[in-house]
């Protein structure tokens, strides 16, 4: 009997957890990160303020909401040559240098990709593989590098070249 009560309690608790998670996630983008057998779902929202683009992130972890942000100056959005791989830490608000972006390509790199079907980022050349996929009404530019086998899918949107997926 105790075993059945315990199982019922767990089922009710898990259903309530799902309801709470739905209340937290409204209309921002939800990205899933998988690394070393771990999976994390991050909520991203983007806000422009003056000459800086802010990526605010959040995640529910251990029944607690954690959040932070990345700030990308306008110069970085135009001419950056590197992706930042700084891991999000709760409460951290990171101002990226003008050479780096997070989750976006710079306008220069995007133009290079569109005109030459290749671009350089993090001292690596990525070449266009295909444009078969779509997300949010945009084609995704599938690129890969021949050295490490990294693949990225980038939204074909010159105003907002969001990196949709990395493998």
Regions found by a protein language model. Give the residues of each.
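Sec-dependent N-terminal signal peptides
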Residues: 4-15
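Acidic, serine/threonine-rich low-complexity disordered tracts
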Residues: 22-87, 91-167
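Sec/Tat signal peptide C-region and signal peptidase I cleavage site
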Residues: 16-21
């Amino acid at each position: 009997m105790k075993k059945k009560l315990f199982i019922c309690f767990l089922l009710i608790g898990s259903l309530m957890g799902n309801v709470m998670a739905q209340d937290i996630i409204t209309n921002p983008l939800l990205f899933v990160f998988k690394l070393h057998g771990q999976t994390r779902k991050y909520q991203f929202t983007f806000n422009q303020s003056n000459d800086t683009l802010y990526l605010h992130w959040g995640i529910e972890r251990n029944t607690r909401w954690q959040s932070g942000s990345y700030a990308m100056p306008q110069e970085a959005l135009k001419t950056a040559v590197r992706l930042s791989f700084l891991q999000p830490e709760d409460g951290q608000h990171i101002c990226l240098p003008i050479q780096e972006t997070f989750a976006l390509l710079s306008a220069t790199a995007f133009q290079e990709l569109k005109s030459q079907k290749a671009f350089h980022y993090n001292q690596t050349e990525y070449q266009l593989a295909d444009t078969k996929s779509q997300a949010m009404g945009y084609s995704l530019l599938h690129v890969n590098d021949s050295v490490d086998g990294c693949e990225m899918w980038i939204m074909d949107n010159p105003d907002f070249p969001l990196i949709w997926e990395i493998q």
